[in-house]
Amino acid sequence: MKVAKIPASKKKRVIRLMGRDRVMTPGDDSFQNHMIKAAGGIPPELGKDGNVVVITKEEWMKFNPQVIYGCGGDRETAKRFFSRPGWKDVEAVREGRIFYFPCDLTCRASTRTGDFVSALASALYQDEFVLKENQVHEEKVFRSRGIKLDLDYVKEGCIACSMIHDFENKTLIIDFKEPMAVISTLEGFREGIETVGNHYSPPPCWGITHRLGLGAERRRIYGVLGKSEKSASLLFTGADMDNLSVQKARFRDMEVYALVTAGVRSNAMRASGDEGKFYEPGTINIIILPNMKLTRRAMTRALITATEAKTAALQDLDVRSSYTPLLNQATGTGTDNVIVARGTGTRIQYTGGHTKMGELIARAVYAGVMEAVFRQNGLIRSRNIFQRLKERGITVAGLVSVDQCECSVESEDLTGGLEEILLQPEYASFVASSMSMSDDHERGLVTDLGAHEHLCQMVAEKIAGKDIDRMIDLVEPDDIPPVMEMTLNALLNGIYRVSDKNFGKARGRNRSKSYP
C-alpha cells in the first residue's frame, strides 16, 4: 500500500549484487527480483533465468541501477569491481546508494520475507517515506500489554505498540506515581521525570530516522505516545521489545529490577580496540529500578556497576567485536545506554561492587543481558563451534587452500572432512580452547606458542593415524591469528594425511614459520 503511492516515474532501478570473481545477479525468474518488485523497485530484465546469472559490464551500464543491495559477503565484490571503469559509472555507485542486509533475509524466502521487503522499500524510498502526506495509517498507539513491577513508586508498566511511519514500533513505558530524579547516559541527570522507557524502531524506520534526525524523531515518538519530553526520559534501540528481559535481584528487603534489551550482531565493539566512526541510538539498553532511594552519587556509581556487569556477560558469551572479530571480544556495542531511577524508601549512598546494592544491580543486569542477547540474537554459551568460527569471520568453505598440494585432492574433500571432524566434541573443544588461547596471545598474555604447536602436531597425527614429518599450509586466509591458523591447519593436515595416496605427495614448505 505504501509504495503504491509512488508514481511510476519515480520508481527506482534496483539490482541485487552477487558473485565474487564476476559480477552476478539473480535471473529474471528469481524470487529475489519478485522481492524487488514488491518493494516498489524495477529489477533488471536480462533475458536469463536462474538463481544466479552473470551480468556483463555492458548490461550493467545499460541498466544503470539507481540502487544496489547485497548481503555482507557481497562487499568484497563491490570492493573489487566498483572502482573499475564502467562498473563505477552507474548512478548507484556514483551516489553511494549501496545497501547491505543480513544474508538470512536477502538470500532465501522465509516467514521474514515481508520484513525484508519493508526494509528494502524504506531504503529505496527514504525521501518519500519521510513525508507525512505519503502515510497510509494514522500514527497512534493501537495496543499495549502490561508488565508487572512490584515497586511502590511505579504506577504502571507496559509495552505499547504504535504505528509510526506506517510501521509497528514498540515502547517499554514505566509511569511513576510521582516525579522522580533519574540519571541517563543519553540525557544526563534529570529531575521531575514521570516516565522512563525504551523505544524500539523497526529496521524500515532506521533510514527515515537518520534522514529526519534523532531530535525530530524523538518529538514525533513522544507525541504519538502522549508523553512530554520535559517529564519523560526514553532510550532508543533497534532491539525488539518482544525480546525484553525483566530481571529482579533480591536480598532481604533490598530489591533491584533491571529491564534489558540487547542486540549485538551489527555494531558490537571493544572499547580501546576499535575505532569510533558514528553515533546512533543504543543497542544494549538497560533501565535500573531499585526499591530504595539512591543518592545522586549512588545513581552515578550504578552506571559503572551496570556497565561492568554488561561487559562481563558479553565476555562470558564470547561476543565478538563486529569490527575486529578475529582479535577482540566485545565490551559493548558502542551505542549502549543506561537509565537509573532514584527510587524511594531507605537511603542508599553506595552502589559499587563491594556493596549489597551494587551486587544486586550487577546480578540483575548480567542476567538481563544474557537473556536479552539470547532472545534477540540466539546466542548461548553452548552454541556450536561452526557458529563461533563464523562470529570470528571464519567459514569452513572459505578456509581451505590446496595450492600447496601436488595430489588430486580437492578443497571440497578437505572442507567436508573438516565439517565431520568438528562435529566430534573432542575436536570442537580443541578449537574452542584455541580460541581462548588466541585471544590471550593477541593481548600478550601468552608469548611462547611452543606447547600449542606441539599439541597441534599430536592432534594432526591422531586424526591421520600416523606420524607427520612436516605440516603443509592448507589454510587459505592470511589474516587469521597465529594460534587459530596453527589449530585449523593441524586439523586439515590430519584430514589430508588420512589417505595413504596423499602421504608423501605434499610439496608444501616445512612448518618453520615462527610465532611470537
Model segments located where?
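Alpha/propeptide regions of enzymes that mature by internal proteolysis
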Residues: E133-P516
